[in-house]
Amino acid sequence: MKPLSSPLQQYWQTVVERLPEPLAEKSLSAQAKSVLTFSDFVQDSVIAHPEWLTELESQSPQADEWQHYAAWLQEALSNVSDEAGLMRELRLFRRRIMVRIAWAQTLALVTEESILQQLSHLAETLIVAARDWLYDACCREWGTPCNAQGEAQPLLILGMGKLGGGELNFSSDIDLIFAWPEHGCTQGGRRELDNAQFFTRMGQRLIKVLDQPTQDGFVYRVDMRLRPFGESGPLVLSFAALEDYYQEQGRDWERYAMVKARIMGDSEGVYANELRAMLRPFVFRRYIDFSVIQSLRNMKGMIAREVRRRGLTDNIKLGAGGIREIEFIVQVFQLIRGGREPSLQSRSLLPTLSVIAALHLLSENDAEQLRVAYLFLRRLENLLQSINDEQTQTLPSDELNRARLAWAMDFADWPQLTGALTAHMTNVRRVFNELIGDDESETQEESLSEQWRELWQDALQEDDTTPVLAHLSEDDRKQVLTLIADFRKELDKRTIGPRGRQVLDHLMPHLLSDVCAREDAAVTLSRITALLVGIVTRTTYLELLSEFPAALKHLISLCAASPMIASQLARYPLLLDELLDPNTLYQPTATDAYRDELRQYLLRVPEDDEEQQLEALRQFKQAQLLRIAAADIAGTLPVMKVSDHLTWLAEAMIDAVVQQAWVQMVARYGKPNHLNDREGRGFAVVGYGKLGGWELGYSSDLDLIFLHDCPMDAMTDGEREIDGRQFYLRLAQRIMHLFSTRTSSGILYEVDARLRPSGAAGMLVTSAEAFADYQKNEAWTWEHQALVRARVVYGDPQLTAHFDAVRREIMTLPREGKTLQTEVREMREKMRAHLGNKHRDRFDIKADEGGITDIEFITQYLVLRYAHEKPKLTRWSDNVRILELLAQNDIMEEQEAMALTRAYTTLRDELHHLALQELPGHVPEDCFTAERELVRASWQKWLVEE
């Protein structure tokens, strides 16, 4: 054994001072001094358990003692009666054996291959013992999980990574996947659990037993993220679920990980063989698979970027020429040729490397250099970790630990050690580059593209840095990284085939590049990821955005401008087709062409297929809404035109719905016979409120009433004859149904028919005569106000003319000015009390004093007050043109009318834009003060003053 170097001899004096008297006074062997000087972990352990040192001095560790681990552990667990006792004994056993392994490793009593074997077997022994103890305990508590035939079902554990390969390092996480064979329920317990519940609960307890820190430390840090769907997936899966996942969604990196998968414990049972046979075709393809090279190249690029990003210098695992590159080299051959060459299907690296050399896939010289480098790096890694039982692969910067490693690696000093290390890593890097390295150096553009790919694929954490986000504020950068991470987690829950993932991996760097160039990157990305979640399983839509960059740019700009549009696109991805043609996207249909376009659109759907007809109507409406909103956002449509388009669209919809309802009713009952000698249908739809006033917003309801001119004695002429008025009632009911039926594309419009005579208590459809009589004899003043904004939106010329005449007659009735003023003002005050703003320090644009409703009441009051003298005031039903008429007819000064018009359109414009932002219709109290003051003054003038 080599003597301690000078720095270590000096450090020994510090060690002596730490040792308790029994140990300090004892005549320690040179071996003990060397190990205690090298490893603080061993020091701490033997100080706590001096008997372990006595045992080591009397029974030196042997290469094959791993064969006794299971028996030694069973003896330690023989008196354990509860979970706390189990946790304590497992931790003490692990620490005791790790001290023995550290002793053997420091003194080089056994080969590095033996050390790796002992570390791996120790972990397996502890995992299996914990599993078996907990399985028995859980069966006593909940019964034994069985399949349909009553056969007991075990929990199988796949050890992944270095644990699976029998190459575990000294201080390591363990990567596990839990599985059980068949579905069924527990038998013999106090209450029945299905197998999924049983194994999930047991799995949770097993992780706690191994992973939870106690005063005795922990056994192993357990990482379950390699399971299907990662952290978002079930903790334990049945064999069937595993098979489905790997067949349908297994990714290249999962193939890579599964190469080393090994069943812990008894690996020769029926279920173990079944699981192995099921996984083999996923890992090892029957054909020679050269696509692996690019996949591993991508993975290595990802690791290299992580090293750069985290500033990992002197990392012997992840750095250039490190342990990971040797693993990649070996696994390239396994994944490319393992399906055709069973000898390559070994989980362990060194035996596989020998096979690679024997098959002449690498030269003997290269294979030997890799073998020697691997053993050198693994010994250095394990020694480094055994100093403090710390999971690190970064070379130390302090003199003491450098001296420790140089001595343990048998070098005179640190420079000699690093010289040998550099030579080994250079050899590894050369072979890696020849086999897997990129063919050409990256251009600046490719480097930037690679950085966006890194942002998407590398699951960066909040505190990670990346140059492509350097222009964002700290909060925005963190938010963007969180959004990407959350989106990736959401994807893990979805069934996305290999093609879909491939398209997504191509799309996302481009999308992130465009989105993150914006100042509002975080907000925009939150809207787009919500949309993408809805379409990730529909590869066609992903391909549309991936293959048409212009469509992607339109999507980003629209989602940035409006969460309403983003929500619509997320709910109804069919609308993404609209993004393909900017000429139509930002150019809404001509106002007089909506009916024709809708008619053409519906020709594609069978007339007798009601479900498809309903769906087509809704899809047409949503596509047109998108175009109107896009033009609104682009500034090509002023507020008046936005409402015009929304109103024309609604009228086209009403026309189509009435047509569908009419065809269905006539097919069932025939036509009312009073129509036999005349044109038309004897039916009209009257629009009130925003529809009647050409003032619809993006999410406005439709206020409708239905009229007919059917005589009392009319009957239908079909086989199922019914009363004519009953026919029109059923027609109106059918219309309401067609509007409100919810399909996969939602409802068409919310319809409110409560403005009909007698409100909700009245008949849904009214005869024209009854309507006229009600308006003349029973209607309240507020109902006459509503009539100011009413017009026929669908109907026969005959009925339309009748309604217009009734409206004109009612509006031109002479009214006593003071009484009318009082009634209108009091109605407004009631509304304000009932509907006014409930938000302190906010202004409700529609309902509050000085808002839109006040302007509407002013115009309605003035029409009802002066139409008797100026019948022309009844011509229009919209506020803007009524204000024009008031000025033209010398009721209101032109300056006041223009000022009210500007205030009205300004406030309406704000409501449109708030709707596009999915925000409520109120703003801070200090907004629109000039407009509100003007409206208040006008209100005072017309509705308060004598």
UniProtKB/Swiss-Prot annotation:
Annotated region described as Adenylyl transferase, given as residue ranges? 449-946
Keyword Isomerase on entry: no
Report the cofactors. Mg(2+)
- Which residue ranges are recorded for the region named Adenylyl removase? 1-440
Q: Which UniProt key words apply to this protein? A: ATP-binding, Magnesium, Multifunctional enzyme, Nucleotide-binding, Nucleotidyltransferase, Transferase
- What's its EC? 2.7.7.89, 2.7.7.42
Give an example GO molecular function: ATP binding
Q: Which reaction does it catalyse?
A: [glutamine synthetase]-O(4)-(5'-adenylyl)-L-tyrosine + phosphate = [glutamine synthetase]-L-tyrosine + ADP; [glutamine synthetase]-L-tyrosine + ATP = [glutamine synthetase]-O(4)-(5'-adenylyl)-L-tyrosine + diphosphate
Q: Top-level EC class, please? A: transferase
What top-level branch of life does the organism fall under?
Bacteria
Q: Which CDD domains match?
A: NT_GlnE_GlnD_like
Keyword Hydrolase listed: no
Record's GO cellular component terms: cytosol
Task: Tell me one GO biological process term.
Answer: regulation of glutamine family amino acid metabolic process
Q: Which family does it belong to?
A: Belongs to the GlnE family.
Question: Which purpose does this protein serve, as stated in its record?
Answer: Involved in the regulation of glutamine synthetase GlnA, a key enzyme in the process to assimilate ammonia. When cellular nitrogen levels are high, the C-terminal adenylyl transferase (AT) inactivates GlnA by covalent transfer of an adenylyl group from ATP to specific tyrosine residue of GlnA, thus reducing its activity. Conversely, when nitrogen levels are low, the N-terminal adenylyl removase (AR) activates GlnA by removing the adenylyl group by phosphorolysis, increasing its activity.
User: What name has this protein been given in UniProt?
Assistant: Bifunctional glutamine synthetase adenylyltransferase/adenylyl-removing enzyme
Q: Which organism is it from?
A: Escherichia coli (strain SE11)
Q: Taxonomically, what lineage is the organism? A: Bacteria, Pseudomonadati, Pseudomonadota, Gammaproteobacteria, Enterobacterales
